[in-house]
């Protein structure tokens, strides 16, 4: 239902257009664009003003939820963030429910909010799905725990755990919906929200962990993922694709004995040479566009054992003893699910070509699928860019799929078109010192709100 929704709007006076983007750099100023979609209607102007009106309150809310530790495995913290957000969605007219997941996936759960179309399901233009997550990679034992303004940035940049990935996106989402509500546009929209509590360390099995999100997508037309946006070369960008992420585990075995007999017919090559053969064959034979594969951990010796989290382990051996065991773990990232299948097949063939007197086996964990770029996705991105131009923020470019990792939107991509990275802009995600650009909160909220209005409201209401 995306195509054909770019409609004529009244030209906004340049003075008013400038007022909408208070504090935004003059470097983003636009000359008069030619597309009618690149102008704001009076309703859209009201929406943009509402974002600015409540900006200070939303910045305070951002600080509040950042200062709640919600590392994925700190379930009480994830639930505490949910307890802050849920009443705010309710105040906007959403019905809210919490789906606990502790017993099914050993994770906190999903927050689901729904705003029905008053005329009945599917009768308010495009049905929109907003997705995000409440957890971060920073567990309670991390020294990185609190929000703070970065000195020398005039209050425009802050640091804090999950500020860009993606607590900032949660506030962008609330700010956009709040502005739509204040302008009178939200009442005509059909919107579903699914916020997971385990995006950074997904619970298993995946069919349960992402069931709520997939079910919502089956009843939606467009998805917006509020993960962090990015600036490339000083320009704001958005993505329409994500790469997959699959973890692999490799084990090799060999016959142990005195090192003087290695390569001989009785003892053969040992487990470590078999491991090296396989990893080097991966390096030589697997490369193709869009594919990365990396061994992140290798253990080997007379004995080797990896811990349950696959983050370390123990290995024992001697310089003059042929290794009997070796273990490795790594990941694969692809631009399509077909590429994932082809890569796994090639890896299995490589593993099966053993050196003498060795054996090897490889397994793959259930992982994140890829989200391929589509024509419908590019049409949606163009509408996002048109909104940005209408706001005086300049066009938005596409950030290529190689700039993004895996994400939840890939689970819903078979059912909807979507945009990736419509949340708070920032840098350094997953690392201590992660930054968020506070001056991007209002622009991102305006882009989201007005795009949602254009996707859901009939023309006669948008022109009011």
Protein language model features and the residues they cover:
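Extracytoplasmic/secreted envelope proteins and their assembly/folding machinery
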Residues: 59-65, 82, 86, 174-177, ...
């Amino acid at each position: 239902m995306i195509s054909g929704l770019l409609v004529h709007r009244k030209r906004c006076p340049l003075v008013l257009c400038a007022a909408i983007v208070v504090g935004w750099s003059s470097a983003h100023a636009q000359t008069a664009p030619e597309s009618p979609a690149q102008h704001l209607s009076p309703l859209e102007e009201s929406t943009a003003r509402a974002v600015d009106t409540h900006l200070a309150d939303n910045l305070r809310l951002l600080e509040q939820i950042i200062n709640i530790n919600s590392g994925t495995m700190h379930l009480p913290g994830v639930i505490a963030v949910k307890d802050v957000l849920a009443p705010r969605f309710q105040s906007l007219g959403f019905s809210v429910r919490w789906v606990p997941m502790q017993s099914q996936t050993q994770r906190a759960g999903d927050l689901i909010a729904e705003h029905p179309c008053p005329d009945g399901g599917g009768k308010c233009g495009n049905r929109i799905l907003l997705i995000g997550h409440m957890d971060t990679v920073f567990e309670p034992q991390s020294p990185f725990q609190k929000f703070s303004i970065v000195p020398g940035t005039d209050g425009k940049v802050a640091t804090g755990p999950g500020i860009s990935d993606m607590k900032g996106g949660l506030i962008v989402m609330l700010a956009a919906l709040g502005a739509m509500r204040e302008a009178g546009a939200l009442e005509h929209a059909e919107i579903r929200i699914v916020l997971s509590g385990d995006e950074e360390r997904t619970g298993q099995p995946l069919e349960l962990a992402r069931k709520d999100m997939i079910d919502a997508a089956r009843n939606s037309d467009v998805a917006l993922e509020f993960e962090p946006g990015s600036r490339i070369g000083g320009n704001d960008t958005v993505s329409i694709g994500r790469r997959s992420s699959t973890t692999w585990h490799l084990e090799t075995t060999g016959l142990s004995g005195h090192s003087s007999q290695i390569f001989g017919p009785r003892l053969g090559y040992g487990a470590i040479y078999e491991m090296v053969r396989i990893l080097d064959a991966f390096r030589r034979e697997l490369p193709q566009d869009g594919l990365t594969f990396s061994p992140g951990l290798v253990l080997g010796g007379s004995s080797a054992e990896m811990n349950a989290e696959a983050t370390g382990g123990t290995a024992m051996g001697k310089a003059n003893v042929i290794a009997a065991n070796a273990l490795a773990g790594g990941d694969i990232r692809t631009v399509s699910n077909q590429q994932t299948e082809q890569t796994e097949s090639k890896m299995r063939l490589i593993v099966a070509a053993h050196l003498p007197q060795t054996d090897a086996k490889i397994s793959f964990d259930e992982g994140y699928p890829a989200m391929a770029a589509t024509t419908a996705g590019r049409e949606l991105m163009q509408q996002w860019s048109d909104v940005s131009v209408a706001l005086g923020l300049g066009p938005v470019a596409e950030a290529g799929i190689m700039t993004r990792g895996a994400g939840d939107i890939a689970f819903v991509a078979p059912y909807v078109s979507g945009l990736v990275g419509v949340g708070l802009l920032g840098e350094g995600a997953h690392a201590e010192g992660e930054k968020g650009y506070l001056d991007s909160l209002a622009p991102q909220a305006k882009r989201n709100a007005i795009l949602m209005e254009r996707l859901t409201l009939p023309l006669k209401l948008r022109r009011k």
